[in-house]
UniProtKB/Swiss-Prot annotation:
One of its GO terms (molecular function) is fructose 1,6-bisphosphate 1-phosphatase activity. AMP binds at residues 25-30, 37-41, 121-122, 149. It is an enzyme of class 3 (hydrolase). Pathway: Carbohydrate biosynthesis; gluconeogenesis. Binds 3 Mg(2+) ions per subunit. Its cofactor is Mg(2+). SUPFAM superfamilies: Carbohydrate phosphatase (SSF56655). Subject to complex allosteric regulation. The enzyme can assume an active R-state, or an inactive T-state. Intermediate conformations may exist. AMP acts as allosteric inhibitor. AMP binding affects the turnover of bound substrate and not the affinity for substrate. Mg(2+) 1 binds at residues 78, 107. One of its GO terms (cellular component) is cytosol. Keywords: Allosteric enzyme, Carbohydrate metabolism, Hydrolase, Magnesium, Metal-binding. This is Fructose-1,6-bisphosphatase. It comes from Kluyveromyces lactis (strain ATCC 8585 / CBS 2359 / DSM 70799 / NBRC 1267 / NRRL Y-1140 / WM37) (Yeast).
Length: 355
């Protein structure tokens, strides 16, 4: 009897009613869009296939000689890694095969990709493998994605078609995103997603081949004494920014009697993931080398800002402007960024006189 009881206790400690990403997507569709066509849900499922494919490829990269440079540069002049090229191909093929994507923007492609024969109603912007320069050292990297719905015919006439796919479908205000997510490939593969109704985190179970809900309804702490910034660029910063970071390191009353702790990995996905879980401030300001900042709006700043805001935080640029209010003119336009716990971002806004 003792053996039976032990087995029963062991079984009861295992949750067998798990929520997979596919189940979560369908549940959300039934709750919030009962008349939905299912196209958006199918697109999200195509995205998770791409994430699983990239995750598996990264895990095997060193064994199949995918570590190192590919000998070319991407759209913004960064040296491409072999995995950058492969990750880009995986993403393009997955989005094309989905049949739900009309327009694709990739960091690795100089121009907009339009799937002319696709009936898709969505535009996807992505950085297939963000932080790839860290891969050789085994540091966590990730995929960042933002989703827009393409422009519908403006006159509402049944005889007129929706957009055939132009830059206008993505060169728009960040508030018009319908979803954003990132996947972090590290010790585990984590997917963090928002469709505009909060933030939820999933972990890939390699045995099941499914993303499992492990961080439901993520919320950022109001404030946390942690800052994340590349202080190797201090000599290039504007005095206002250098002064602000210096003040964070003081054990002043304003900092509750102790200095902020520095936590910087150098991979945006990993740094933002930590910030979402623990709180604090992540920043990549403009400097003398990159006055407008270095992060691309469409597939870095926009999706991360959307996620952080949906988790109760804030995201602004060096001038204190809300990231999601900005409108890019080109698909690879850049921005500075300060994001994280609302109290910590407010501290920066007060410092520059915007609060």
């Amino acid at each position: 009897m003792a053996g039976i009881k032990h087995r029963r206790d062991s079984a009861e400690s295992i949750n067998t009613d798990i929520i997979t990403l596919s189940r979560f997507i369908l549940d959300q569709q039934h709750l919030s869009a009962k008349n939905a066509t299912g196209e958006f849900s199918m697109l999200l499922n195509s995205l998770q296939f791409a994430f699983k494919f990239i995750s598996q490829t990264i895990r095997r990269a060193e064994l199949v000689n995918l570590i190192g440079l590919a000998g070319a540069s991407n759209s913004t002049g960064d040296q491409q890694k072999k995995l950058d090229v492969l990750g880009d191909e995986i993403f393009i093929n997955a989005m094309k095969a989905s049949g739900n994507v009309k327009v694709l923007v990739s960091e690795e492609q100089e121009d907009l990709i339009v799937f002319r024969n696709s009936p898709g109603k969505y535009a996807v912007c992505c950085d297939p493998i963000d932080g790839s320069s860290n891969l050789d050292a085994g540091v966590s990297v990730g995929t960042i994605v933002s989703l827009f719905k393409i422009h519908e015919n403006q006159n509402g006439n049944s005889g007129e078609e929706d957009s055939e796919g132009t830059i206008n479908d993505v060169a728009r205000c960040g508030r018009e995103m319908v979803a954003a997510c990132y996947t972090m490939y590290g010790a585990s593969t984590h997917l963090v997603l928002t469709t505009g109704a909060g933030v939820n985190g999933f972990t890939l179970d390699n045995n099941l081949g499914e993303f499992i809900l492990t961080y439901p309804e993520l919320r950022l702490p109001e404030q946390k004494s942690i800052y994340s910034i590349n202080e190797g660029n201090t000599c290039y910063w504007e005095p206002t920014i250098a002064d602000f970071i210096a003040k964070l390191k003081e054990n002043s009353e304003e900092n509750n009697g102790k200095p902020y702790s520095a936590r910087y990995i150098g991979s945006m996905v990993a740094d933002v993931h930590r910030t979402l879980l623990y709180g604090g401030l992540f920043s990549y300001p403009g400097d003398k080398k990159n006055p407008n900042g270095k992060l691309r709006l469409l597939y870095e700043a926009f999706p991360m800002a959307f996620l952080v805001e949906q988790a109760g935080g804030k995201a602004v640029n060096d001038r204190g402007e809300r990231i999601l209010d900005l409108v890019p003119q080109h698909i690879h336009d850049k921005s500075s960024i300060w994001l994280g716990s609302s109290g910590d971002v407010d501290k920066y806004l007060k410092h520059i006189g915007k609060l």
